[in-house]
């Protein structure tokens, strides 16, 4: 819940001086990316900009305090301010900020700018007191903001110092409007106007000018002069002489003498007590100060000129001038030391009554009241956790004694979930074990089950599925149905374990249950996770169309709940890319993989390994080995600089081994094979994948017998576990083994099985990646004309993809090849005496590659009748009558030239 006053522009008071000369300068702010107003405290920055902002509807205002150094809080208020300025235009960004569903501030801002691209009118955002920001992550994000904000957007920053926003670069590019303390200082005319409005008796212009010079135009000093003159009935000039040369760092003594000591005791106590509030309203004042009418008292203090300012148009929220507020808080610590904890407790109670637990925690911490802090956390901590208020929660839990946590074990559970969210897995188990050992009395069974659900999640994340399954089952046996969050966690973990074990049907059922529970209770990240797992399971079962449809539901969930910037979004676009690759939709697969990299752009480069692997796969399927090598260099660098799940390593090794196969790099394959550990099992898709990598390397090295043993065992496991996509891949690799070892009948048998299974999986690229050896076999099957209709259609499609991407169309019949062929001693006499033209050689190459007449015409960009003429001529020159005879003749020529066909 956002505090309204932080989003309200300060009210323009009637007695303030209108700074016409500065307003004229600010009138051109829309021509700049950044308008920067800097000066020490008390020079009128906020007053000036609030005057300029008056009447501007499309302007948001964000007043900072120290708590805004938390990234999530900063983002929530900034987006809310822009929503006020645009009338709710940026709904997606708002939802992402409210639910903390973004990877980083920069990625949230990127989404914001996408929405603002449709906003065409001038737009302003004012950020006041930016000097309070000390978080370098926020500085980095705001530099990104300034670089990429729309041209019609102006950021206005008010700060006591020069902010770390790349000011020099903006200044050089003439994109910066600056107003500093020298310009903000009152001139003689403005000082005269000021005193005329504040003092009951007018003063001469010369005297006014002299006082202005004495304090160097410092607005706060002028205000103090007027206040002192009213309270003490002595001349304003006497006050001016006291303030001459003074600055903010030496102001405390003056404020004590001239302000605090000149108000009655009641007002003094009111000022000191209320100053602990960063912002205040009637209810807060009544509780903190004991005044019966807080609103009336606030308005009275405002009328007395005691540096209190309204924060919104309704007049409900107030705050002290930062300089005066800081002074009062310091004095409060000195003068009301004994009362201060009680004052903070009262403030916390009032904030709680108004529904602001984060502010209440701030005061409970300041009060040092562990019991109050504990009670707030027991009632509100999980909501704060779900809204990613992690830093505040961590600070709060550290402030509680361990005994208090033991007395309230759900707070121990909260602390453990905080550790889990930060990937501190070993600390989670240590904390829970210590708590179980030291909790007095018998531990509640439900709480123990919640501990086990969390432990199960930690175990699966840490690569320990056996322990994860044991703990998840224990949790589910003991958790009541009402404990939905822990039941969702445990059910999800159990489903994931069964997926790892190859029990796909039961795993799918549990993931569907997880989705239903998560949707019902609005636990959206687990709903998305369960959909991703369902899609992976369906892919493994060979039901790729069902996997596609599940992915569509996941994309819809991401859109509806604004989950675009969760890291899980990358997982979804990655498995979509895998599916598109399988179906030979390579351009779409590449685009999807690149979008996954974009989702992870703010994370460590190692997180991009899987998507980079897919980019290599796309290059390999296209036959673009140069590009594949370039991408592999980066991939291998990442492999050497990270610790990865076996699934990630298996996928990365797959593209490396395929690349070595396509380039004949036996040395690299042999070296990899020597150092690669062999998995103990092959009961899931990633273990099957790594064994397949081993078999492919063995085939490349001519180690056919051990490779065949591996593949036969993989097929047995795949059939028993219904890992149909893996079976399809295994059959294709077994086909290559048989083909290369000269067992052509066996090769044809398993290829027919693979084609039949592809009717279910839809695989195309898995065939294409095997290149010319696959093309030759498919040509033969097509020429036999015995394939069922679906297999025939798929074989023709695969052949077209191989011809398109691997450039086997007529590469063997180029001019250089033909010249060498004609000079070969064994060339048939018919070809030597009646040579083909270059175009006829090209046509022969395309016939050999399986092209129809229409496809040849399209490839060579000539009429179909012209192709028929070329075919008739080359048939006559070769002495053949049928297409199949021409293919066999071309194959004989290639063998004669030493090509392994």
Swiss-Prot record:
Cited InterPro entries: P-loop_NTPase, Sig_transdc_resp-reg_C-effctor, TPR-like_helical_dom_sf, TPR_MalT, Tscrpt_reg_HTH_MalT, Tscrpt_reg_LuxR_C, WH-like_DNA-bd_sf
Activity regulation information from UniProt: Activated by ATP and maltotriose, which are both required for DNA binding.
GO terms of biological process kind: positive regulation of carbohydrate metabolic process; positive regulation of DNA-templated transcription
Protein's UniProt keywords contain ATP-binding: yes
Phylogenetic placement of the source organism: Bacteria, Pseudomonadati, Pseudomonadota, Gammaproteobacteria, Enterobacterales
Protein name, per record: HTH-type transcriptional regulator MalT
Gene3D superfamilies membership: P-loop containing nucleotide triphosphate hydrolases (3.40.50.300), Tetratricopeptide repeat domain (1.25.40.10), Winged helix-like DNA-binding domain superfamily/Winged helix DNA-binding domain (1.10.10.10)
Family label: Belongs to the MalT family.
Binding, ATP: 39-46
């Amino acid at each position: 819940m956002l505090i309204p006053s932080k989003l309200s522009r300060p009210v323009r008071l009637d007695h303030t001086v209108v700074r016409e000369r500065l307003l004229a300068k600010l009138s051109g702010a829309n021509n700049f990316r950044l308008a920067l107003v800097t000066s020490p405290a008390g020079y009128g920055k906020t007053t000036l900009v609030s005057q300029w902002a008056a009447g501007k509807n499309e302007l948001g205002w964000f007043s900072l305090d120290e708590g805004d150094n938390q990234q999530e809080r900063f983002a929530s208020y900034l987006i809310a301010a822009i929503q006020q300025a645009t009338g709710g235009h940026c709904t997606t960004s708002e939802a992402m900020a409210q639910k903390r569903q973004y990877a980083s501030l920069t990625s949230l801002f990127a989404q914001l700018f996408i929405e603002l691209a449709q906003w065409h009118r001038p737009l302003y955002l004012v950020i006041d007191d930016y000097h309070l920001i000390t978080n370098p992550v926020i500085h980095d994000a705001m530099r990104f903001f300034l670089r990429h904000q729309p041209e019609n957007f102006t950021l206005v920053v008010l700060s006591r110092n020069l902010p770390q926003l790349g000011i020099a670069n903006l200044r050089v590019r003439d994109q910066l409007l600056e107003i500093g303390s020298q310009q903000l200082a009152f001139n003689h005319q403005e000082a005269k106007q000021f005193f005329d409005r504040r003092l009951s008796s007018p003063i001469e212009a010369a005297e006014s000018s002299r006082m202005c010079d004495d304090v160097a135009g410092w607005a706060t000093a002028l205000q103090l002069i007027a206040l002192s003159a009213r309270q003490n009935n002595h001349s304003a000039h006497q006050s001016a002489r006291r303030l001459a040369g003074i600055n903010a760092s030496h102001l405390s003594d003056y404020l004590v003498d001239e302000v605090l000591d000149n108000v009655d005791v009641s007002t003094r106590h009111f000022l000191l007590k209320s100053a602990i509030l960063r912002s205040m309203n009637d209810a807060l004042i009544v509780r903190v100060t004991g005044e019966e009418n807080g609103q009336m008292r606030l308005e009275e203090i405002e009328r007395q000129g005691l540096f209190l300012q309204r924060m919104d148009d309704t007049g409900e929220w107030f705050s002290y001038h930062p300089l005066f507020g800081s002074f009062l808080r310091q004095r409060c610590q000195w003068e009301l030391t004994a009362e201060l904890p009680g004052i903070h407790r009262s403030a916390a109670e009032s904030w709680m009554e108004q529904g602001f637990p984060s502010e209440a925690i701030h005061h409970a911490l300041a009060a040092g009241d562990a019991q109050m802090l504990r009670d707030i956390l027991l009632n509100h901590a999980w909501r704060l956790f779900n809204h990613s208020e992690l830093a505040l929660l961590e600070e709060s839990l550290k402030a509680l004694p361990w005994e208090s946590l033991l007395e309230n074990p759900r707070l121990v559970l909260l602390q453990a979930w905080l550790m889990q969210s930060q990937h501190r897995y070993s600390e989670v188990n240590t904390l829970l074990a210590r708590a179980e050992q030291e909790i007095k009395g018998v531990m509640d069974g439900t709480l123990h089950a919640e501990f086990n659900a969390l432990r199960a999640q930690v175990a699966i994340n840490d690569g320990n599925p056996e322990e994860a399954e044991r703990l998840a089952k224990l949790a589910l046996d003991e958790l009541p149905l009402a404990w939905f969050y822990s039941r969702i966690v445990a059910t999800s973990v159990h489903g994931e374990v069964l997926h790892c074990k190859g029990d796909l049907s039961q795993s799918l059922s549990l993931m569907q249950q997880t989705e239903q529970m998560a949707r019902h209770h609005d636990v959206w990240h687990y709903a998305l996770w369960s959909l991703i797992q369902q899609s992976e399971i369906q892919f493994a079962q060979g039901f790729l169309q069902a996997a596609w449809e599940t992915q569509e539901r996941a994309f819809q969930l991401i859109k509806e709940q604004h989950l675009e910037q969760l890291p899980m979004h990358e997982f979804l676009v990655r498995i979509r890319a895998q599916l598109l690759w399988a179906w030979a939709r390579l351009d779409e697969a590449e685009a999807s993989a690149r979008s996954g990299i974009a989702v992870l752009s703010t994370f460590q480069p190692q997180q991009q390994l899987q998507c980079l692997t897919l980019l290599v796969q796309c290059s390999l399927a296209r036959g673009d080995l140069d590009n594949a090598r370039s991408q592999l260099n980066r991939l291998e660098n990442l492999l050497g600089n990270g610790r990865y799940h076996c699934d990630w390593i298996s996928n990365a090794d797959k593209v490396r081994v395929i690349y070595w196969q396509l380039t004949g790099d036996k040395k690299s394959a042999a070296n990899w094979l020597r150092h690669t550990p062999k998995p103990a099992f092959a009961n899931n898709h990633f273990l099957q994948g790594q064994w397949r990598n081993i078999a492919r390397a063995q085939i490349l090295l001519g180690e056919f017998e051990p490779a065949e043993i591996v593949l036969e065992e993989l097929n047995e496991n795949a059939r028993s576990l219904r890992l149909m996509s893996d079976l399809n891949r295994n059959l294709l690799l077994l086909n290559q083994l048989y083909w290369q070892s000269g067992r052509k009948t066996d090769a044809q048998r398993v290829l027919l099985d693979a084609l039949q299974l592809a009717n279910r999986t839809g695989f195309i690229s898995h065939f294409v990646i095997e290149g010319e050896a696959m093309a030759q076999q498919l040509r033969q099957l097509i020429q036999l004309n015995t394939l069922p209709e679906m297999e025939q259609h798929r074989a023709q499609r695969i052949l077209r993809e191989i011809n398109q991407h691997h450039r086997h169309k007529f590469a063997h019949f180029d001019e250089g090849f033909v010249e060498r062929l004609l000079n070969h001693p064994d060339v048939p006499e018919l070809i030597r005496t009646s040579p083909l033209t270059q175009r006829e050689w090209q046509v022969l190459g395309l016939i050999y590659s399986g092209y129809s007449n229409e496809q040849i015409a399209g490839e060579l960009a000539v009429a179909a009748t012209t192709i028929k003429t070329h075919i008739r001529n080359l048939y006559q020159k070769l002495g053949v009558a049928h297409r199949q005879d021409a293919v066999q003749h071309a194959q004989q020529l290639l063998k004669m030239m030493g090509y392994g066909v």
